[in-house]
Amino acid sequence: MELYYYEDCEYCPAVFETIAKLKIMDKFTCKDIRLNPYYAKELKDLTGNVTVPCLVNEQGPMKEAKDIRKYLASHFD
């Protein structure tokens, strides 16, 4: 799975806290869209914008932190 984020995002820490709590960090490729402009382009091509956090799994992109956390808890807890 891929997780698009940037460090100053106010919603990203909650997603990272859930990932840490579930001990599943190894399941992600984390892509900071501010450190790597190519990641921002990937995200824009995929979703039409550069809103983060964005989790991409086999079903496609998921954009809301609340939805991402709920998905992670239901699939990895």
Q: How would you name each of these model-derived features?
A:
Residues E10-Y11, P37-Y38, K63:
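Short alpha-helical
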Residues D32-N49:
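Thioredoxin-like thiol-disulfide oxidoreductase module
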Residues M1-K27:
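Local sequence-structure signature of Cys/Sec-based thiol-disulfide redox active-site neighborhoods
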Residues L46-V56, A65-K66:
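Structural micro-motif
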Residues N57-D77:
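Non-catalytic, surface beta->alpha helical segment in thiol-disulfide oxidoreductase systems
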